[in-house]
């Protein structure tokens, strides 16, 4: 299942389309690819008494995305009950390379890992945009500084370009996913000030 999970007005994740499809599925195993809030897969498994595995989608939105093809993936993560995960892995092993690293965990953990990825990438984009602004004021070439910076293998070059005519992050994934994890944090009494600052700064760029 890979259907949209748009952002609600309060920043939460709208999973109504996902649940509708789950309710209609009669297959022995459901692979859920859509990004959903933490706890959703477990909730649906119990509610509908179906075998559901969360195996997050990473295809991205550009033709240059490093994971645009399944054959480019070096790892896969599976979240759910063990019997369902075993069934899913058996299916995937018929199409993936034997050197692909497989990670298994409960669905809550894998759902959180997906949010961690997108929230971090959104934060990285805003960090680079702010550094770009500082470079501009100091008369420094951001791109030259960037090349030296990313030479450190700990940094990573993805999401470090800054586009003058399209500042901040956008698309259909990063905005809704960072908003969703902020919403989830607040529901359990956490004030995620860093992530909220990232969202607010991104709004300044729009």
Positions of predicted regions on the chain:
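Structural/interface elements that position substrates and couple domains in central-metabolism enzymes
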Residues: 1-206
């Amino acid at each position: 299942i890979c259907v949209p999970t748009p952002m609600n007005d309060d920043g939460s994740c709208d999973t109504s389309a996902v649940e509708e499809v789950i309710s209609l599925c009669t297959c022995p195993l459901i692979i859920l690819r859509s990004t959903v809030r933490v706890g959703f897969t477990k909730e649906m498994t119990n509610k509908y008494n179906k075998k559901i595995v969360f195996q997050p989608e990473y295809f991205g939105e550009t033709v240059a995305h490093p994971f645009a093809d399944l054959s480019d993936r070096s790892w896969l993560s599976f979240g759910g009950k063990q019997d369902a995960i075993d069934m899913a892995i058996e299916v995937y092993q018929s199409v993936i390379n034997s050197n692909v690293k497989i990670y298994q965990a409960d669905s809550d953990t894998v759902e959180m890992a997906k949010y961690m990825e997108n929230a971090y990438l959104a934060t990285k984009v805003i960090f680079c945009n702010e550094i770009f602004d500082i470079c501009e004021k100091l008369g420094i070439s951001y791109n030259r500084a960037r090349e030296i910076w990313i030479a450190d293998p700990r940094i990573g070059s993805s999401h470090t370009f800054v586009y003058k005519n399209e500042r901040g992050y956008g698309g259909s994934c990063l905005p809704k996913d960072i908003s969703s994890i902020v919403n989830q944090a607040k529901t359990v009494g956490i004030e995620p000030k860093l992530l909220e600052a990232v969202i607010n700064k991104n709004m300044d760029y729009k």
